[in-house]
């Protein structure tokens, strides 16, 4: 293995290795023989751009990690990627390319066939580019066989869902109030309305004159003046308290609790509440529409202009408590209107312009007409107040145009009838995290029928034909089925406009049936992926491999793809199509904002993956260590730290590989049984930690918690192996002879590192593949063809792990003590003292005494109970009257006096067991830690550091011998650095030259043999300096000049 970690060159080498050796293809063949299956369906990304967002990369890396892990776990994985290729985003992009301003231009100027071909070309080109990007970051999926919603087989399969809905009596054509984009000229379903903008709109209070009165008015509030021409009735809550308010000889009717706010907003100071009354008194009251003389549609609506009770639909958080209702432009208005038999007046065309029935306003854009409507109200004394409001308003998720609500005829699937089935199926699914279940459950409880039709061009054509003669509806379930009933030839391409020409024979009257012009909701396309992606004979394949074992996407897909899949599954299969759902977070910048080019905070993946400082695995590791379901904040500092961590992991394998190769170590000729007697306690500890981590990782991955896999494995290699175990065993590796002690250490390290390599391979496949090819004996073609390491329970030892954890805590306290005394860790000390509160801890510490000695860098360590600390300290307790008084009342003064006279004894007991007991005036008293302030002073010449289990004591002053050894170790550290600078291999010898201060010359001569053994120097010349590399070093305020030459 190269001694230096170079991410980019390593990754390019591995990409080439995978391609030249057809590793994915071999893996697929190898994996196909496994008995257990793991069916994964890729939530298809939308190819609106040739370069993936870094959030999409996170998504794909999570999927890749899980698929790689499941292969290692012995599952036959289905890893087909997908692309969601239809819909408005691509249409809008092509419209921009072609300079199209309105939908009719596509038909009249471009031609639907040309437009659809352009959309297809755009989708395929971007999908091809995305595929290259995904392969470049090591995503092992079947890229030669992706499913695409534009493929004819996919479209053909998808039709079966609509046919099934029809057969179940769920498919119908009806009128509902839906969001509509006037620019794209198509409807949007509720779940597509997820994007909002802060928009300034009018905020007006309008007076509707009560019929038959001279001066009584109902006051309504609206921010959509354009809906007033379509007003039919007014809604109230009959249980609210309403008021008649006198203003300028007019009586204004509004909710009592809203009077103050309305008057304030309207700037009216002089007003008087004449009377208050329950809303029920208003029910049935008739009014005169203020624009009846200029809006044609208002003629004939007089009998419907009444006040109706809408119950809790009317609130008092804003407005007047009276709500203007236009059933043609409001969903609640529509539902209430349906109950009372009110007509649906819808006055707006597909482009958001008023229809002729709007009278004066015909042809005008509804939002632009607002000011004209306000002026007309003002002229008719119907405007109480006009202002502005900035509020969150829904916009089209692709073109960003403000949406409008329209009552329009569309095709629906009646999923509201399936609510109970859907809720039941949600309970049968594993949700990770479990709040995903709550969120999607809340959606289902509010479910509305699924509007599946869209008035566009680039999409899956609805397979609905209607007979011209008898109106019979024929729903087709596949291409094969269409070919059996078609009078005309079925085109190769099932898209519009070619499918529009297919005529079907009516199965009732024998007449000609023509297809409806609509295409399907784009969420329908992806929602059928669980079966439509399986190609021909999908039903047979589904029986073999269904249901889906896992789907995973961002948390926004709880209302998107997961919801669509659930609906489709229950319609088609009477069950959820998936067994488990994993939700991941969004990718944000360091400030928690979404990443967009317009904000200047957008980072392209290549800025990391092609950066020589980072590379692909750095990005993958950083992404996968983020808690999967939480939002991640992109950070260059975090990437820097990840690179350092990856470098440590690389160096661990370099260390092991180097020494094992030097000693020609072959793990195949050994096993733990014949080496067991030579295992030291640190070896047993490592085996215990390794098997425990493997067990924990497997448990985590049962719930697809990839962040726990990534964090546990990297932490194990960095903290347990690199920073702890290798420190303990390094000298065993330096031993030139092949003694059993060394071989035992090698074997344990090899087994642990090989297993760790396999477990890390789903996270960092490039780095692990490179190491695997050099490090592992009897290797397979690729690390991805290995099997997960087994958990050997017999090696998990709680006792040893607790002992080592205690030794680490003691070492940490020792470091703190050294820092206080200014003694470097490299400088050995003669004695250290460890005093522990618990007898069990004392016993455990003595079991790992040699480890503690090493960690504290001391020649000897004394370990004992906490009472031993008294030899090195003075402690005393001072009374705390503030807590003694309330607890002991009349005994306070006596207890204070007792503490002052027995200060050390009280303090000693409280430190040892948390309390001190005494009898005062015949009453038992327990003095606790809150009753005293404990002051502690370590004896002169010593330094101590407390931790939660005891205290570590070190002598401040070090002997001359200890000082010399410390300086020599500092010199050795500099020499090791210089060896690296000269690229001297670990087994190569050097010639060493040292010029030291005159008073240190004798010291160096005394330590020459030690220096030679530690630096592999054949000769150490003191006094003169020469060599291939000469550097001056300042050590303890003294200058040393060191020269190193290759021997």
Swiss-Prot record:
Keyword Manganese attached: no
Gene Ontology terms, MF aspect: aminoacyl-tRNA deacylase activity; ATP binding; isoleucine-tRNA ligase activity; tRNA binding; zinc ion binding
Keyword field contains Cell division: no
Gene name linked to the record: ileS
Lineage, opening ranks: Archaea, Thermoproteota, Thermoprotei, Sulfolobales, Sulfolobaceae
GO biological process terms held by the UniProt record: isoleucyl-tRNA aminoacylation
Subcellular location: Cytoplasm
Catalysed reactions listed for this entry: tRNA(Ile) + L-isoleucine + ATP = L-isoleucyl-tRNA(Ile) + AMP + diphosphate
Record-listed ATP binding positions: 597
Subunit structure: Monomer.
Record family assignment: Belongs to the class-I aminoacyl-tRNA synthetase family. IleS type 2 subfamily.
GO CC aspect terms: cytoplasm
Obligatory cofactor(s): Zn(2+)
Taxonomic superkingdom: Archaea
Keywords attached to this entry: Aminoacyl-tRNA synthetase, ATP-binding, Cytoplasm, Ligase, Metal-binding, Nucleotide-binding, Protein biosynthesis, Zinc
Swiss-Prot/TrEMBL domain comment: IleRS has two distinct active sites: one for aminoacylation and one for editing. The misactivated valine is translocated from the active site to the editing site, which sterically excludes the correctly activated isoleucine. The single editing site contains two valyl binding pockets, one specific for each substrate (Val-AMP or Val-tRNA(Ile)).
Descriptive protein name: Isoleucine--tRNA ligase
Annotated Pfam families: Anticodon_1, DUF5915, tRNA-synt_1
Motif ('HIGH' region): 45-56
Predominant cellular place of this UniProt entry's protein: cytoplasm
Gene3D superfamilies associated with the record: HUPs (3.40.50.620), Isoleucyl-tRNA Synthetase, Domain 1 (1.10.730.10)
Enzyme Commission identifier(s): 6.1.1.5
